[in-house]
Amino acid sequence: MKIPPGTGLLLVGSGLYWVLSGPLIGWFSVLNPSQIHLSQMGLTLILITGIACLVLGLWIIPTDLEELCRLFTRNDGWIFIIPIALVVADIYLTLIGLSQGSWELNPFVASAVQIGPWAVVPFVVSYIALSEGLAIWMLSIGKWLFGAARPSRFMPFALVCGAASFGPLSNVGLLVIPGISTLSYFLGTIGMTGFSVGIYQHFRKQPPYGNPLFLGPTT
C-alpha cells in the first residue's frame, strides 16, 4: 500500500509535539498539581509514542520532501508555501499578544515561550511540519475523492488553508481591539471563508496539467 505524501511530515510534527508535551505536562503538574497530574508512567508513554512517531516520520519523510520540491517548482508553486506562511504569522502574532498580555493564550504555547528556546524551536518545527504535512495530505485526499482531472480535487487543500488562517486572522482582531473577543472570532471566520474560496478559485482558473498534483500516475 502506497503511503500518501505528507504522512512523514505529519508523523514528524506529531512526534515532536508528543516529545515536547511530556516536559510541559510535567512542568504544569509541578505548578498546578491540583489541576494537572500525570503519573511517571504516563509521561514515559507520551515520550515513547513521540519518539516512535518521530523515527517513523524521519524514515519516510524523503518522499514528502521530493513532493514539496515538485510542488514548489510549479508556476504557482508559491501557493503551497501558504501553510508555512500562516504558521509563521500565527506564532509571530501570538508572541506579540503574549508580550502585551492582551488575551488568554494556549497554555502550552505560553509555557513553551516561558521555558525558553529549547521548547520554542521544536514547537515551531512541529507546527510547520504538521501544517504543511496536512496540506500535502489533503492534495492526495482531493485526488482520491474527485479524481486527478477535476479542479474540485483542490478543495480539501483550500479548506485546510482556510482553517489554518483562522488563528492569525483572529489574532489580528485581538491586537486591534483587545477588549472585544467577539470581533476576533468574527474576523477569523470571515477571513477563513474568504481565504478558502480565494485559493479554490485560483486553482479553478489554472490550466489543466498532465499530472496536476505530482502525486503519482493519474491513471
Q: For each predicted feature, which ranges?
A:
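Hydrophobic alpha-helical segments at protein termini of multi-pass membrane proteins
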Residues: 1-219
